[in-house]
Structures are given as C-alpha cells and as structure tokens.
Amino acid sequence: HLREQEGVNDPDVLPEYLRESYSYTDTLGPVSVRETFARVYGKDWNLTLDPSKLIPTVGASGGISLICSMFERSGEQVAYITDAPTYAGFTARAALCQHASIFSVDMDGEGPKPELMRKQIRAAREQGYFVPFYYTVPDGHNPGGFSFTQKRREEILAVVKEEGILIVEDAPYLYINFAAADKRPKPFFSMAPDQVVHLFTGSKIGFPGPRVGFLYSEAELEISEGQTVPLSELALVESSSELLFHNPGALMGFEALLHDADGQGGFTELQSMWPLAESKLVVYRENREILLQVLEQELGQHREYFGWTLPDGGFFTVFSFLADGVNGPVLTNDAMIEQMVMQHGLVVIPMYDFYPIDARQRDTGAGMNQLRLSFCFSESAGQARRDDMREAVMAFCVAAKALVGIAT
C-alpha cells in the first residue's frame, strides 16, 4: 500500500538500517547508535565509554526524571542536594514526589561552596533523609550564567566522595562553550565516571526536535546486604517500567549527525562533536558578543547600579541591580516584570523563582534584584538577527536606566 501510494522503498529491499529502526531491537535501542556515540563523545573527553551503559532518554529532562524515579521508588524519604539558584526543571520534577525534599547550597563566582555542601548533606541525614546525589549544571550554569572553575569542581568531587553521594551532571551546554580549548574545565564524568551520572542531550547542538539524550554512569550501587549492582542496570529497569525509551528512528537520525560526507559518495564517522557544535556556536557566540558589548556600552559607566556575569558557556547572563534607584530598591518581582512588558515591550525572566524554597527561607531577598538574560535568540537570520538582538538589548538598557532613575 505504501509503495503504491507514496512510492516508498520495496519492503523486500528495505535498507537494513531502516529495518532496524522500525523493528524490535536491543532493549537500549539500536546498538550502532550507542557504539558510534560512545566513540565520538569519548574521544572529546579522553574516556573509553561502555556503550552498554548508555541509557537512551528523552533529552536530558528524561534523564532527570529517570534518576529521580529510581531513588524515589523505595518510598524512603530522599533529599536532593542542588545549587541555589538551580535549574527550574529539576525543582519542578523533585516537587512531583511527596517524599522528596531539596537542600540547596549557596554559590559564589566559582560554584557551590564546598563546606556548605557538606553541611547540607549532613543536615539532611540528621533529619532522617537518604541523600542519593547532588544535581548541577556545571557548564554554562542555568540559570547562574557562569561555569564552575576547575578548582571548585575538584573540591566538590572531594566532598561527594567523602560523603558517599553521586553527582548528577546535567550537560546541555557542554559544547556551548566560549572559552579557549585549553581553558575549558573538565566535565565531572571525565574526572570520576564511577561517581557521576552524566546526562547528555543533543538538543542544543543541532537536533532539538527529536529530544535525543543519554544517561551514562559507571557507578556501582549497594542494594542490600552489601550486594552491589551497576547503576546503569538499575536505570535500565527503571526506564523500562516508566516507558521512557526513545524512538529508534530518532536515535538513528542522531547517529547520522555523527557522520560527515567523505567526498566519495559515502560517509565517515566524526572524530569529535566540536565541529558539529560549531555550526550553532557561530550564532550563539555572536549573540553573546552583542549582548555584552551593548551592556558595557550603555551601562558600563554605571557599575554602581548594574552588574552582569560574563558567561564562558551556555545561553545566559545574570543581570543584577546593585544599588537603590531614585525611588528605592529595584525589586525584580511580578510587578516589575509586568512593568517591563507594559512600558517597554520587554519580556524578562526573574531569578527568584530559580531559588529552591529553603534558599528563600534563608534569604527572603534571594534573586529579588536579578534577571536572567538569554542570548540564544535565532528566529531571524544573518544581519536581521544581529539587528534584532542589538535592538532588544538596547531596549533593555533603556528600561534598566529608567528603573534606577538615570536619564536617557
């Protein structure tokens, strides 16, 4: 029927890769996809990845849901350690479980403070919680607008090893990196693959629609009476029970991205994912430069009022109002957000919602003077995109000045 109606391939001569895509396969999806990804991704981070430990997920968000479900299933009271502020998608997922709580760790310009992390882990345990992991986005932190330093990563790793918990490393912006190659800090999973649950997504580097992702870990977990099993096996069982597997066709499409034409009518496997990411980085890098240039040009002489992060990776900078304006403190509350829309035609994202509840209890003003500014805009193309980006940042600068009472 399909051959007659649509002119598709004769099923008798269907290419094997298509037959595999739409037939029952290995429980983890097409083997070739995991093998190819393991080779290419592993080369970038000087690791030999075991394809059998790659669990396909629906983007990195699917990995977050999977790892949370795995530790929540026993019904035990669990406490998740995370940053203050942290990714809203993680706090939203954690909130779905009535017996899960978040213990957050305040950050400085290098990352979460190690001794505060240790304190929070122990505080959670003293209150009767099981603490399975620390969740973070260390590269291009969302929403923090910076990347953790190498020194701080090593300090964090020391704490989690001593305290016996895992790191869940959400890595959507690992390749959205603006630092020189020799200045980039190492991802956690390349430093200690047996201590880390690494979440990869293809969404930020050119394959957003199909939501392809992988969970990878070489950790071993104790399940009872000293018996240990690979975390990847438990994740596989959990994934099966939650029906979180990906479409094999989407995985095959992702595998195609990991190849390039060889000039002779065939294809060859990429030696790195950096060239693939560069097609997107060209746009993001330029957008970042426009954002930072205009902020400096328009607001740089008023540093007593304004500050912003200089992101080495990711999509965001955090903009802060540092001093009172002529009408008092500038609060990035709902009223201010509405004012930005109504008076200036600007949609901005306040930071306070990214702070977990316990962080706002410690500091009722957490994030109340900050906005998250994004530079991933790419709806228009070429010079039109550049002009649109510049116009938007200029409009924001006019609004920021108005909020503190600086004449324009």
Where are these regions (language model features)?
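Conserved core of the PLP fold type I
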Residues: 2-163, 168, 174-191, 197, ...
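Conserved core segment of the aminotransferase class I/II
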Residues: 13, 124, 193-285, 293, ...
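Conserved glycine-rich beta-strand-loop-beta hairpin in the small C-terminal domain of fold type I
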Residues: 86, 248, 272-292, 296, ...
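A generic structural signal for well-ordered alpha-helical segments
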Residues: 94, 160, 299, 340-341
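Glycine-centered flexible beta-alpha turn that most often forms the glycine-rich phosphate-binding loop
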Residues: 170, 353
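Short hydrophobic/aromatic beta-strand micro-patches
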Residues: 216, 318-320, 374-376
